[in-house]
Amino acid sequence: MEYNTSELCDMYLDVVDVVEPMFSNYGGCSSFGGSISTIKCFEDNGLITDVLQEDGQGKVLLVDGGGSLRRALIDGTIAELAVSNNWEGIIVYGSVRDVDALEELDIGIQALASIPVGADGNSVGEVDIPVNFGGVTFLPGDHIYADNTGIILSPEPLDIE
């Protein structure tokens, strides 16, 4: 489904939180949204791989990677896993790699930057907890909408019809 965050802000500005503009699009889908699952990890993507093995229909994985630009939390293999399990998108407060492969995949991916160095895979971190970055607190189950213009968050799904 296509989302236009500008139009959604015009209709729901009193309901949504707007994430500070710092993200770039790396996936093949420039517009995506859904109910969020959260992960907090630092330079380690083991938990990301674990969570993306679950059915992601209607969900967006939101990763608080501490804003690290030193290690990529998402790569082509992890993104392919997300696609195969029907995730709508991934938002990473951190870095990605394999950007040419990511842009070919049918999934939305936004991150701060790209870097060729991969992350550790020790599964260190926390899942389904509140996380805060970009001036917004994200709670598991909140609804997120993203496009090339920005990212917005709502406690309930927005009526976009």
Swiss-Prot record:
Q: What does the UniProt keyword field contain?
A: Cytoplasm
Name of the encoding gene: rraA
Species assigned in the record = Shewanella oneidensis (strain ATCC 700550 / JCM 31522 / CIP 106686 / LMG 19005 / NCIMB 14063 / MR-1)
Origin superkingdom:
Bacteria
**SUPFAM superfamilies, from UniProt?**
RraA-like
UniProt entry tagged with the keyword Acetylation: no
Which InterPro entries does the protein's record reference?
Answer: RraA, RraA/RraA-like, RraA/RraA-like_sf, RraA_gpbac
Q: Which cysteine-cysteine pairs are annotated as disulfide bonds in the entry? A: none
Annotated GO molecular function terms are:
endoribonuclease inhibitor activity; enzyme binding
Q: What name does this protein carry?
A: Regulator of ribonuclease activity A
Gene Ontology terms: cellular component:
cytoplasm
The UniProt family comment states: Belongs to the RraA family.
Query: Where, per UniProt, does this protein localize?
Result: Cytoplasm
Q: What does this protein do?
A: Globally modulates RNA abundance by binding to RNase E (Rne) and regulating its endonucleolytic activity. Can modulate Rne action in a substrate-dependent manner by altering the composition of the degradosome. Modulates RNA-binding and helicase activities of the degradosome.
Query: From its record, what is one biological process in GO terms?
Result: regulation of RNA metabolic process
Instruction: State how it assembles.
Output: Homotrimer. Binds to both RNA-binding sites in the C-terminal region of Rne and to RhlB.
